[in-house]
Amino acid sequence: MSRKQLALFEPTLVVQALKEAVKKLNPQAQWRNPVMFIVWIGSLLTTCISIAMASGAMPGNALFSAAISGWLWVTVLFANFAEALAEGRSKAQANSLKGVKKTAFARKLREPKYGAAADKVPADQLRKGDIVLVEAGDIIPCDGEVIEGGASVDESAITGESAPVIRESGGDFASVTGGTRILSDWLVIECSVNPGETFLDRMIAMVEGAQRRKTPNEIALTILLIALTIVFLLATATLWPFSAWGGNAVSVTVLVALLVCLIPTTIGGLLSAIGVAGMSRMLGANVIATSGRAVEAAGDVDVLLLDKTGTITLGNRQASEFIPAQGVDEKTLADAAQLASLADETPEGRSIVILAKQRFNLRERDVQSLHATFVPFTAQSRMSGINIDNRMIRKGSVDAIRRHVEANGGHFPTDVDQKVDQVARQGATPLVVVEGSRVLGVIALKDIVKGGIKERFAQLRKMGIKTVMITGDNRLTAAAIAAEAGVDDFLAEATPEAKLALIRQYQAEGRLVAMTGDGTNDAPALAQADVAVAMNSGTQAAKEAGNMVDLDSNPTKLIEVVHIGKQMLMTRGSLTTFSIANDVAKYFAIIPAAFAATYPQLNALNIMRLHSPDSAILSAVIFNALIIVFLIPLALKGVSYKPLTASAMLRRNLWIYGLGGLLVPFIGIKVIDLLLTVCGLV
């Protein structure tokens, strides 16, 4: 579930952004953006020149210099406004989370058990390792792990999802987040962080931090923009002696205007806004990125590791068929399978009971009335079952049942091996049923591949992204599901060590890997992956290992994360192309206007036939300022994204933003020149 999206130009945010834009005019804020800092210096210089001209201290057209100065200040303000608006949208999204931190006091237990004596302490004084008790109606005061109890928890303040979730001690559902509310029962929680280090604190600090860390690509682009600025600064500085030698020296105001129009001010003014907006869009999708670096890495990812259950399939495996062993009738197998599943509350266990009832009208029986003993499933045994009278019935994985049969002096039938392979090749998971040492047959558990997932994988393949399915199933089952879903590769019988080894293998090949995880056993792989999306419902260890947290705990979100990352990179690249391309058109406006008096041959470049040198220069400066504000919506929303190959995407962007960057300034500058002339302003 995504958070409610803010309107692009929310009035409250616009007003606040305008105030922030003015505050950012101070030099300490400006020098962080070298391109706009040059514009700021130019604005200050032309302001001083226009004042000197107005007072008679310098010869020249004071009104023209004042107009140039005014529009240069507007250029700086628009760049500041773009960044402030992007930051304001992120802060507004985080403000809803600030309200979550309501807990004033907590009940700190003197001993780590329910019923122990408790002291009432301020929540902000809780330290890592402290034990607290929370009951129905309480706000959880800190991030932590449940060490005793189980409760229904409302996490809507953080996730936006209204349905409560169960949190209990043990397993992968023991992690709780400070600021969420207990709806029923109680929990004893061990705090896992110190004050100011909670999940909420980190998220709010990230989006409200005064200094956002630049990503590697952003730094590289900034260096390129600085290099271009230095080149154009040196070129402009050499033009004054050339014009003076020609007998008609160009004024400093015109040279400043020329410099500002030559340097890439459009992308320079929008670069920070694009980065902030990328993280904001991620937050809008209910994904918390710990840094802009993580969002950028998502755009460069070329390998996706996707869990089969819940991501590729619906995750609710259902019993679909009873396949008896040779010499066993299907009803006998169904009866034994139902008995073994009577106390099994998993979706798979319930589906076995229901299938036996539907096929053979076998009614459910009460385990207690039968004086039976239920044997629960464990990760070590990998099977479950029931002991009733003198019958010992088990169901489980093929390997587990094989070991069980051989341990009881039996022999695993060859025909059952064949039936297991047949089920696996169909993409189902085989469960073998045994009574004593006699194998009765196989239950086929079928998981449904999500609709449309094959098409999504085909789109990712077009983009050059390899998809790898991760599953605990055997190789035959994994291969069948992988073929049905359309993934490029799969890892069967996956263990945490195998996942980690696979990630390292891809990274050694120079690839960037993304994955999701929710358990403590996923933490090593999450820490190794370039983009690691931890589920909010997962353990604290998983969330700390990842560089993103999905508040919806939806493994499929990884594909959306990659799309948002690629959209941010495309937006930055597209606007850079547009910015550099539209500088070319400005050359045709300013250079003939500034130097035609000295070098008449330059009139040949005046293809726009602008009214006068002053109107040409002023029109170019005005366009240079206005184009920033017109591109703010594109910087904040991102360019339209379509899954294409890298070469097709490059061609598309060059046509739209390269050619568009050449044509738009010609039209815009000409229109502004006509308006200035008609209004008699030049």
Curated annotation (Swiss-Prot):
GO molecular function: ATP binding; ATP hydrolysis activity; magnesium ion binding; P-type potassium transmembrane transporter activity
InterPro entries found in the cross-reference section: ATPase_P-typ_cyto_dom_N, ATPase_P-typ_P_site, ATPase_P-typ_TM_dom_sf, ATPase_P-typ_transduc_dom_A_sf, HAD-like_sf, HAD_sf, P-type_ATPase_bsu_IA, P_typ_ATPase
Residues of the active site: D307 (4-aspartylphosphate intermediate)
Chief location of this protein within or outside the cell: membrane
Gene3D superfamilies, sorted: Calcium-transporting ATPase, cytoplasmic domain N, Calcium-transporting ATPase, cytoplasmic transduction domain A, HAD superfamily/HAD-like
Cellular component, GO annotation: plasma membrane
Root EC class: translocase
Transmembrane segments: 34-54, 62-82, 219-239, 254-274, 588-608, 616-636, 656-676
Tagged with keyword Transmembrane helix: yes
Pfam families listed in its UniProt record: E1-E2_ATPase, Hydrolase
Binding site for ATP: D344, E348, F377, T378, A379, Q380, S381, R382, M383, S384, K395
Subcellular location field: Cell inner membrane
Enzyme Commission designation: 7.2.2.6
Function, in words: Part of the high-affinity ATP-driven potassium transport (or Kdp) system, which catalyzes the hydrolysis of ATP coupled with the electrogenic transport of potassium into the cytoplasm. This subunit is responsible for energy coupling to the transport system and for the release of the potassium ions to the cytoplasm.
Family annotation (PANTHER family): POTASSIUM-TRANSPORTING ATPASE ATP-BINDING SUBUNIT
Binding partners and assembly: The system is composed of three essential subunits: KdpA, KdpB and KdpC.
Family as reported in the entry's similarity comment: Belongs to the cation transport ATPase (P-type) (TC 3.A.3) family. Type IA subfamily.
Listed NCBIfam families: ATPase_P-type (TIGR01494), kdpB (TIGR01497)
Protein name in UniProt: Potassium-transporting ATPase ATP-binding subunit
Species of origin: Escherichia coli O139:H28 (strain E24377A / ETEC)
